[in-house]
């Protein structure tokens, strides 16, 4: 009984689409990361150019919303629909297994809305016995540029056609608008009269689409047996698409017999008659063509991309081609221009239009190199194609990784998404000479059109009347009538923004975090580091490197000081007023700012002593301030009046103000003016010149400073004075969002001060301070519904006990925006995003709403707290801290047992990141900053180290504290000239060689991963070069016996390699044994004090594909070819085999359950074997095997008490859980591994790692609640999974009782939740069980959606499940990853 939880989402971008989605005029970007849909908006930010003083404008991406989808996305297209909710366009999303979803943006809910979902999984379409299953077939989605219909090719030869209603469907063709975005698209405005008038005359459609229909491709043409690619074309009045296909399957091995067998045919569709017409067909095209790219005007037609050439076909069927390497002539007889000197490989390349009038296109190769594709235009046709690599002066010439998706955004920007590296937002511009030339050319075109004769104009009229006209509008495109489109070399590219990607994660290891210099000197008070850290190899080719993952924020400690009985701490930064105004000298400018650190020491129940320090560099010096809290009253809050240059201290009984030197300037007592009763302050909020204080009778005291800086009370209305409040918060609105809901203002006012009050009945009141005007009342805040508004909730049932509500900015400096953060008495954090929507038929009337953000982090239960005692009973004295600037981020800190930060970046939603450290109170005060070079976009922190090489394997050397890397780089592969069987290889005369890999073994020290200059340091470390055509297949740190006499054991680095020279040459392998030794370092580089010393080397027959330690005598288990051998290291450096087992095809995985001798052997084709190794005598025995012949990509043991499970990841993104149970009758006396469950995760697994599991806070509470010693029933192991797209998953065993609760909860959530895109999570996970004995694996990400539900629905579902809320929270905490307490 297991549960799969995705700790980190996919990071590699697979699809991208630029579309006005959030509004009709917005610039938005839809990004898909396998099964994660993200919506970004584009914002222009002023930035300083490197090496220049002037500012230049950059465009940044800001995440608006993201959705985890229950499906794998295979296609993405934009569709113009009638009367969309946002006024923008809709998006058609294609999924694996022939599903389509049409979604749009709903501004009322601030989320996507599913218009429709289309399933094409019917048996009558896929029941043919010789057709593969849908999940084994690719699909192609394309939408007509005018959004009249979409075509969806699925199941190889099925074509689904979905018509879309457009303005003028029932009118004459005079209302035709061109495909360039003119005409039809202008009628999408909801307020426009054109659409309304047409709706009155025509039909009002209930849906934006008409019924779809499915046709076999053979009905279009019987010869379409092997479709390759298709796309809708521009400049046609009727929906018209071009399809690339062949009558026989293309094959490189059968090239002499199947040369130039590809056809390109253009069909036009008649949607009413469900018929098609062939417009043109081109035969005998190169057989390596794989994609059709429709080209907009001025070029038009289609560009066909092959592995060695580019072919352009216009609307009349005229062809132009260019070969980009020397093989283009050998693989095809098609006529093409020769540019073989470029030596380009076009496999899986990306081509994107640059969007200008020249028709140039950007070509991105799999290496990341970029080139420009230019079309020579001769009148109204293309007369030639040329390809030009970007020169060095173009600024950016490569993105260093293959692009998986691209989209033209407009305004000189292109987005390139990648699965192998970071995705980039590129900007391009022209030099001044190019701009001037384009203007002259445009002017020439206009002049030519003005001087055109009547006969020429009549010819143009003929083209306009032609149904399939190839004449574009010259005045619209500004295209020159002839000549090359533009002079080459005038493009300048630069990167505006990046989306970080840590995929593919190729290998993973765990190592100890080495001590810092402060810790080595004995100052352990500075240590906040974890025991272990996870280091993974990530990226491909030149974007490769390492990534260090941490479960919590590991702060960089700058200094520390020991203070006894410290209770709270504050900081205050002041600027001397007279120096700020008149200070001009350098000396005065340096002394104008002073930063104080104020700590309080507990002296008694109601007494505190204030300790004051002044910051001097990285040191703290005591500062004497006799006026500062001389009565030792309890401090509630300390803040700074920025504009008044005062420090304000809120005590229980009074408010004290201090000047620059902390001399007392004012005392304001806290009492009730109506009754003259003395009151005490319990919380306070300070913002600039305003101070809001909540007293012990739940009344509000509001103070505001005058021009002199003195505080005076400001009386609000009677509703505020008589109200009872739980929490108060002041917020300075920098964006003008809250002022926009005031209908009396013509435009929003920025930097207005607002007061937020949470009443006892949990209504949120929003006041503007300057005129005490009530702008909005948010009802039912304690209901925690997904959407908060001024309307009362429909169902008023169970409520959450809220103790605090604040409004604060979250995000980076340029993207900080307000968020409402609610805190419950159990430390649950609920985050809402405020937004303003238009209400009513009259424009200008807006209402304020709050949209709930996803938060899957559960608070820890403090030690010593029982389940019946609320953990937040004393948290009023520990309020949330608003941090306006912490390392460039605006964040909120939560103290207490679950101490951490609420952080939001431009690429992430607000999320909670825990602060590392024990919960126990200590006398040490540490002064820290956020760790440098660290990303906070996810639930775990990520620190990347760029190496510029692909790292395939890595291991941690426990004896030296070094990381050993197996890297590779691309090299040319040449046939061996010394082969006696093939003497003809010596006469090979080619210059364009195939690509192979050259491997190195390198060392990296942990300190290099922590330093900011690690990129430079790594290349000074020791490396060991392997032979030609020799690849690193495995690296392991193994404790080997190094002496046969003394039986001494040492930790050695064992490396397995393979010599691969082609399919027809048998592969060989080699086993290397290294020891990391200490040497005399280079004086200029003291970090080079380690070296790899070769201890042993053993060449073997067959590739060494996997390694593992086995047994207790220091032996290594080696998978070599079709055998698995146990070898021991001899003193002469050879490795002697002592036991072996014959395998079948290709051993992909070898794992041992440490110290037991039990091992699993995974075959890439024949499944997994469970074997055992015995030492007396040396023997390997087969215990059981899998009879389903799984394609094993990764495998690992998973012990659960007395049961032994084996987790297997196959090549179809599935997880299989097998069990070895010889007592089960179905196991055939233990010879068969029993299949217990199957779970589809949607990602290709790269590694599975068995890790120990620690107790979570809820389990610690249960174990400590009873004084008797009880057995720990919690599981002791879990499996960490890495994937090719950068995601990180965790498989956890759960007890029977918890499984029943969570299984029932999963069924309830599947049936009751509204799932994005209308998908079914149960169908996506496709859980299969082995009869009645098997239990399906649970989906942890679906279970965590219970946390984000409203309080009423959570209680209802918990009641249906038959569990209490704290029990479900405890179960969710166990599967959340908190069991990795040592990380």
Curated annotation (Swiss-Prot):
GO terms for cellular component: nucleus. Residues 448-467 have a biased composition (Acidic residues). It comes from the Eukaryota. Disulfide bonds: none annotated. GO terms for biological process: mRNA processing. It holds the Pfam family Beta-prop_RSE1_1st. GO terms for molecular function: RNA binding. InterPro entries: Beta-prop_RSE1/DDB1/CPSF1_1st (IPR018846), Cleavage/polyA-sp_fac_asu_C (IPR004871), RSE1/DDB1/CFT1/CPSF1 (IPR050358), WD40/YVTN_repeat-like_dom_sf (IPR015943). Residues 441-482 are annotated as: Disordered. Its main location: nucleus. It is found in: Nucleus. Keywords: mRNA processing, Nucleus, RNA-binding. Belongs to the CFT1 family. RNA-binding component of the cleavage and polyadenylation factor (CPF) complex, which plays a key role in polyadenylation-dependent pre-mRNA 3'-end formation and cooperates with cleavage factors including the CFIA complex and NAB4/CFIB. Involved in poly(A) site recognition. May be involved in coupling transcription termination and mRNA 3'-end formation. PANTHER family: DNA REPAIR/RNA PROCESSING CPSF FAMILY. This is Protein cft1.
């Amino acid at each position: 009984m297991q549960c799969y939880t995705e700790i980190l989402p996919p990071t590699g971008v697979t699809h991208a689409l630029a579309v006005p989605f959030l509004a009709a005029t917005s610039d938005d970007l839809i990004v898909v990361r396998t099964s994660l849909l993200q919506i970004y908006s584009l914002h222009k930010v002023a930035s300083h150019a490197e090496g220049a003083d002037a500012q230049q404008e950059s465009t940044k991406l800001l995440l608006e919303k993201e959705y985890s989808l229950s499906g794998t996305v295979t296609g993405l297209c934009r569709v113009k629909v009638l009367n969309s909710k946002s006024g923008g366009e809709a998006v058609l999303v294609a999924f694996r297994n022939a599903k389509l979803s049409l979604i749009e943006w709903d501004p009322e809910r601030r989320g996507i809305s599913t218009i429709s979902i289309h399933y094409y999984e019917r048996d009558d379409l896929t029941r043919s016995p010789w057709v593969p299953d849908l999940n084994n077939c690719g699909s192609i989605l394309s939408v007509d540029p005018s959004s009249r219909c979409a075509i969806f090719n699925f199941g190889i030869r099925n074509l689904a056609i979905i018509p879309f209603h457009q303005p003028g469907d029932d009118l004459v063709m005079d209302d035709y608008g061109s495909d360039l975005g003119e005409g039809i698209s202008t009628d999408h405005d909801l307020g426009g009269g054109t659409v309304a008038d047409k709706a009155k005359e025509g039909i009002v459609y209930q849906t934006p689409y008409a019924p779809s229909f499915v046709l076999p491709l053979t009905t279009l043409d019987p010869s379409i047996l092997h479709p390759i690619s298709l796309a809708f074309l521009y400049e046609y009045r009727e929906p018209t698409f071009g399809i690339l296909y062949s009558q026989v399957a293309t094959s490189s091995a059968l090239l002499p017999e199947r040369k130039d067998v590809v056809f390109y045919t253009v069909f036009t569709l008649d949607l009413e008659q469900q018929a098609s017409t062939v417009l043109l067909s081109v035969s005998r095209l190169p057989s390596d063509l794989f994609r059709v790219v429709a080209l907009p005007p001025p070029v038009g037609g289609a560009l066909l991309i092959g592995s060695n050439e580019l072919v352009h076909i216009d609307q009349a069927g005229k062809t132009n081609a260019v070969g980009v390497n020397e093989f283009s002539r050998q693989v095809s007889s098609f006529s093409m221009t020769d540019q073989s000197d470029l030596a380009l490989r076009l496999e899986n390349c990306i081509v994107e239009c640059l969007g200008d009038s020249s028709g140039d296109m950007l070509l991105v190769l799999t290496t990341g190199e970029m080139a420009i594709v230019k079309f020579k235009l001769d009148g109204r046709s293309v007369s030639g194609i040329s390809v030009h690599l970007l020169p060095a002066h173009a600024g950016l010439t490569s993105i260093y990784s293959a692009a998986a998706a691209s989209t033209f955004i407009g305004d000189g920007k292109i987005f390139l998404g990648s699965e192998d590296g970071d995705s980039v937002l590129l900007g391009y511009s022209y030099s001044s000479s190019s701009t001037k030339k384009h203007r002259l050319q445009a002017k020439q075109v206009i002049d030519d059109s003005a001087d055109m004769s009547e006969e020429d104009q009549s010819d143009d009229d003929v083209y306009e009347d032609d149904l399939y006209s190839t004449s574009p509008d010259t005045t619209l495109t500004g295209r020159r009538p002839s000549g090359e489109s533009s002079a080459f070399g005038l493009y300048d590219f630069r990167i505006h923004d990046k989306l970080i990607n840590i995929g593919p994660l190729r290998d993973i290891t765990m190592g100890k975090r080495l001590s810092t210099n402060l810790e080595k000197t004995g100052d352990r008070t500075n240590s906040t580091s974890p025991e272990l850290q996870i280091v993974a190899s990530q990226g491909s080719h030149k974007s490769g490197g390492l990534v260090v993952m941490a479960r919590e924020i590991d702060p960089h400690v700058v200094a520390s000081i020991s203070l006894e009985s410290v209770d709270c701490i504050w900081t205050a930064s002041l600027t001397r007023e007279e120096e700020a105004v008149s200070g001009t000298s350098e000396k005065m400018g340096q002394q104008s700012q002073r930063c104080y650190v104020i700590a309080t020491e507990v002296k008694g129940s109601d007494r505190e002593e204030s300790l004051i320090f002044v910051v001097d560099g990285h040191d703290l010096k005591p500062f004497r301030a006799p006026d500062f809290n001389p009565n030792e009253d309890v401090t509630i809050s300390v803040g700074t009046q920025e504009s008044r240059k005062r420090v304000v201290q809120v005590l229980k009984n009074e408010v004290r103000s201090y000047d620059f030197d902390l001399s007392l300037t004012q005392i304001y007592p806290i009492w009730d003016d109506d009754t003259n009763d003395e009151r005490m302050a319990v919380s306070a909020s300070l913002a600039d010149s305003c101070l809001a204080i909540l007293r012990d009778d739940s009344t509000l005291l509001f103070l505001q400073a005058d021009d002199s800086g003195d505080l005076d009370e400001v009386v609000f209305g009677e509703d505020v004075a008589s109200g009872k409040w739980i929490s108060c918060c002041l917020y300075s609105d920098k964006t003008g969002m809250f002022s926009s809901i005031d209908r009396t203002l013509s435009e929003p006012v920025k930097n207005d001060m607002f007061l937020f009050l949470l009443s006892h009945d949990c209504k949120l009141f929003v006041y503007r301070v300057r005129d005490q005007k009530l702008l909005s009342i948010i009802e039912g805040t304690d209901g925690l519904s997904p959407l908060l508004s001024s309307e009362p909730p429909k169902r008023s049932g169970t409520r959450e006990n809220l103790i605090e509500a604040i409004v604060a900015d979250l995000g980076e400096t340029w993207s900080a925006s307000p968020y409402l953060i609610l805190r419950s008495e159990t430390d649950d954090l609920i985050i809402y995003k405020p937004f303003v929507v238009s209400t009513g038929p009259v424009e200008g009337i807006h209402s304020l709403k709050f949209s709930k953000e996803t938060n899957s982090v559960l608070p820890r239960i403090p030690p010593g707290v029982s389940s019946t005692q609320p953990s937040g009973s004393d948290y009023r004295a520990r309020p949330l801290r608003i941090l306006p600037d912490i390392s460039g981020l605006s964040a909120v800190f939560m103290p207490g047992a679950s101490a951490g930060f609420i952080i939001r970046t431009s690429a992430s939603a607000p999320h909670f990141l825990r602060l590392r450290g024990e919960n126990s109170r200590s006398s040490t005060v540490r002064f820290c900053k956020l760790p440098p070079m660290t990303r906070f976009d996810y639930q775990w922190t990520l620190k990347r180290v760029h190496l510029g090489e692909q790292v395939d394997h890595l291991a941690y050397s426990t004896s030296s504290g070094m990381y050993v890397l197996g890297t590779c780089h691309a090299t040319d592969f040449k046939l061996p000239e010394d082969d006696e069987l093939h003497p003809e290889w010596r006469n090979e005369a080619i210059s364009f060689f195939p690509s192979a890999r050259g491997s190195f073994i390198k060392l990296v020290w942990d300190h290099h991963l922590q330093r900011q200059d690690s990129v430079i340091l790594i290349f000074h470390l020791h490396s060991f070069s392997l032979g030609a055509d020799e690849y690193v297949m495995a690296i392991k740190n193994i404790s080997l016996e190094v002496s046969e006499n003394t039986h001494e054991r040492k930790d050695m680095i064992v490396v397995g390699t393979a010599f691969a020279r082609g399919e027809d040459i048998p592969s060989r392998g080699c086993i290397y044994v290294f020891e990391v030794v200490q040497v005399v370092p280079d004086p200029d580089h003291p970090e080079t004090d380690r070296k790899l010393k070769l201890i042993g080397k053993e060449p073997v027959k067959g590739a060494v594909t996997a390694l593992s330690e086995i047994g207790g005598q220091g032996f290594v288990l080696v998978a070599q070819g079709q055998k698995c051998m146990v070898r021991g290291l001899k003193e002469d450096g050879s490795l002697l085999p002592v036991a072996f087992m014959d395998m079948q095809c290709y051993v992909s995985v070898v794992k041992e359950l440490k110290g037991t001798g039990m091992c699993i052997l995974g075959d890439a084709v024949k499944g997994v074997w469970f074997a055992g190794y015995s030492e007396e005598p040396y023997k390997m025995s087969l215990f059981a095997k899998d009879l389903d012949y799984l394609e094993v990509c990764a495998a690992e043991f998973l012990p659960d008490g007395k049961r032994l499970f084996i987790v297997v990841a196959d090549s179809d993104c599935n997880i299989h859980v097998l069990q070895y149970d010889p007592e089960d009758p179905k196991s055939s006396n233990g010879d068969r591994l029993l299949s217990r469950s199957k779970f589809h995760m949607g990602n290709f697994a790269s590694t599975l790692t068995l890790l120990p599991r620690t107790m979570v806070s809820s389990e610690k509470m249960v174990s400590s609640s009873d004084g008797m010693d009880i057995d720990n029933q919690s599981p002791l192991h879990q499996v960490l999974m890495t994937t090719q797209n950068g995601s990180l998953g965790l498989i956890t065993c759960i007890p029977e009782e918890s499984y029943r609760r969570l299984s029932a909860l999963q069924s309830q959530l599947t049936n009751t939740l509204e799932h994005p895109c209308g998908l079914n999570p149960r169908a996506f996970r496709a859980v299969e069980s082995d009869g009645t004995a098997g239990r399906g694996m649970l989906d942890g990400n679906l279970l965590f959606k219970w946390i984000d539900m409203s309080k009423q629905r959570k209680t209802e579902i918990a009641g249906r499940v038959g569990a209490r809320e704290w029990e479900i929270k405890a179960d969710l905490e166990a599967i959340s990853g908190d069991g990795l307490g040592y990380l």
